[in-house]
Amino acid sequence: QGVSSAASDVYKRQDFDLEDLLRNGPEEKINLTEFSQPTILVTSVLLAKYSNKLSNIDITAGLSLGEYSALVYSNCLELSDAVKLVNYRGRLMQEAVPEGTAGMLVVLNMPINDVYKMIDDINESDETINFSTDNADGVSVLAGKNSAIEACKNYIANGEFRRVKTQMVQMSVPSHCYLLDEAQEELAKLLNEVEFKAPS
């Protein structure tokens, strides 16, 4: 009951129908980062609250968007404030990078030193690619404009990397890269207006 109550309270406070989006889509809208971020946040928080009813959760941690979920679950941040933040965060990101002009590339089975060398080599040309996320050993995520992504694919295809594979991330905006520098500055202004509490 507590989980349903928390969800209902958040649904009522948004300037779009979050509950309908969660239940009915459409997928094209959910894939836009300004909507995917709040839907993922709410879903992950509610799942954590439900899981805690089954067994106590003592520690939370999160990366990127997941950090907001961890802050909410540990009572550092109100869920309604977090939804407001990530919706604004997603909107800023969406506005910063026109849809379809940039992306994120997962590079599998490439030694990390080779990944960094590839980035250096590509950045010495007319392209700019950033190391976005180190997901796991042999799983690197890069971010940049489409032309830089293609440069990475060509670099790998023309090199002696027998087991290396690539895959595009299904996101409308690349994360953790230079293309979002201005969005980061704008988000900081809203973050300064939100109350953060000690975890409990």
What is the predicted role of each segment?
Residues 44, 62, 66, 78:
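Gly/Ala-rich beta-loop-alpha elbow adjacent to hydrolase catalytic centers
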Residues 1-11:
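Single conserved hydrophobic/aromatic residue that forms the stacking wall/gate
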Residues 69-73:
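Hydrolases whose catalytic domains are alpha/beta-hydrolase-1, hotdog thioesterase
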Residues 47-55:
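Conserved acidic catalytic loop of the alpha/beta-hydrolase fold
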Residues 57-61:
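Short beta-strand immediately N-terminal to the catalytic nucleophile in serine-hydrolase-like folds
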Residues 16, 74-200:
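Alpha/beta catalytic cores of group-transfer enzymes, especially the acyltransferase/condensing modules
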Residues 38-45:
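Alpha/beta-hydrolase active-site loop
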